[in-house]
């Protein structure tokens, strides 16, 4: 949707959200929390079945703490924070998508996975490799040095996150 705005002597069409577009913080928080619970459950199930994982929150927490219990606690905090933050991103992007809530979530999950694998995994594993002076911890693009299973497990988890976020947030917002 576009609106016209006068700036000095010029009038331009400026893209903006529809007038009825409002973000409900409680809905974003609850749907983000639920989607984070879903991705966590999928990750734990895949781990239980012996599928390799890309666990960025744990990688980040290991950069700051060394006690194994604190690593897990900090990693869980980072994981939850990221899940809630990306729910806000979805709330901002979702009105621009023109598909069903589940399809919007699926698209968001794929894009999120691609960004994590193309930017997050190589960057954070490179930082860890530099800090530890150990090249063996570098995971590579799309976790290529961890095997295809790690990237596919991450894809499955992010699809579950995206679809659950899309279904819960999208359907409730459209009511």
Task: Set out the residue ranges of the language-model regions.
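Juxtamembrane/disordered regions of integral membrane proteins
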Residues: 2-175
């Amino acid at each position: 949707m576009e609106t016209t705005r006068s700036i000095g002597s010029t009038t331009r069409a400026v893209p903006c959200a529809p007038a009825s577009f409002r973000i409900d913080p409680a809905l974003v928080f609850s749907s983000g929390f639920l989607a984070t619970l879903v991705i966590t459950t999928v990750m734990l199930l895949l781990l239980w079945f012996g599928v390799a994982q890309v666990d960025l929150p744990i990688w980040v927490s290991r950069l700051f703490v060394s006690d194994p219990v604190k690593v897990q606690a900090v990693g869980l905090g980072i994981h939850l924070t990221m899940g809630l933050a990306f729910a806000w991103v979805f709330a901002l992007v979702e009105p621009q998508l023109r598909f069903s809530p589940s399809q919007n979530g699926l698209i968001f999950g794929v894009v999120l996975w691609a960004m994590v694998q193309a930017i997050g995994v190589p960057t954070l594993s490179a930082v860890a490799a530099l800090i530890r002076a150990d090249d063996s911890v570098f995971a590579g693009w799309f976790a290529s040095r961890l095997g295809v299973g790690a990237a596919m497990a991450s894809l499955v988890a992010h699809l579950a996150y995206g679809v659950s976020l899309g279904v819960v947030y999208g359907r409730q917002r459209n009511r």
